[in-house]
């Protein structure tokens, strides 16, 4: 726990680029001596962040159902380190939040993102009137489980309903996440009994 706190302070205070001669930039870097403390443990990313790692480092993710997965962020090599940019607004982090840092010697450190919008929050929507659903660009909504009848636009009626969504991130090389979008009419929630009945109705739609 002490190591986690120290690293968080290190990241908060240190990841600020400073311009110097020859277009180099200097700021504190997580060295392998420091990262050794996390082998077998987890390093957490909780906000938009630049993670400065030693040269030769990689950020990777496990394959999903046989499809290769690559980290979707931007990396910027410098003279003595690599800056890895984590933009937690990327919808991919709602679907995949476990990664790992790999060294040149193939040592692995678990890396987990906990600051992105959770998938369940994106895909469970309460409403009082018809609304425009707030889903990231690239996610398509369908009326049917076979993904044959897409919803025209993003405007949905406020009624208890299950839609089906497909998200095909470019860094999964052909793989698509097939999920369910549940809409709840909050005007009808008067008791837990009503809520349970609506949930059962959603299950019958699946």
Curated annotation (Swiss-Prot):
Q: Which domain of life is it from?
A: Viruses
Its keywords, alphabetically, are: Signal
**InterPro entries the record matches:** Corona_6B_7B
Q: Show which residues constitute the signal peptide.
A: 1-17
This protein's name: Non-structural protein 7b
Q: What species does this protein belong to?
A: Feline coronavirus (strain FIPV WSU-79/1146)
């Amino acid at each position: 726990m002490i190591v986690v706190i120290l690293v968080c302070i290190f990241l908060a205070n240190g990841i600020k680029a400073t311009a110097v001669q020859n277009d180099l930039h200097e700021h504190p870097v997580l060295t392998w001596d420091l990262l050794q403390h996390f082998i077998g443990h987890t390093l957490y990313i909780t906000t938009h962040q630049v993670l400065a790692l030693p040269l030769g480092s990689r950020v990777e993710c496990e394959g999903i159902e046989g499809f290769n997965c690559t980290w979707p962020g931007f990396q910027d090599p410098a003279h003595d380190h690599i800056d890895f940019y984590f933009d937690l607004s990327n919808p991919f982090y709602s679907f995949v939040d476990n990664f790992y840092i790999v060294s040149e010697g193939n040592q692995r450190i678990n890396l987990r993102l906990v600051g992105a919008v959770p998938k369940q929050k994106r895909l469970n929507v309460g409403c009082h009137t018809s609304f425009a659903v707030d889903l990231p660009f690239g996610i398509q909504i369908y009326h049917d489980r076979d993904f044959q009848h897409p919803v025209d636009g993003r405007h949905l009626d406020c009624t208890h309903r299950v839609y089906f969504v497909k998200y095909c991130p470019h860094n999964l090389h052909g793989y698509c996440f097939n999920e369910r979008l549940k809409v709840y009419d909050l005007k009808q929630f008067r008791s837990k009994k009503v809520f349970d009945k609506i949930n059962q109705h959603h299950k019958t739609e699946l």
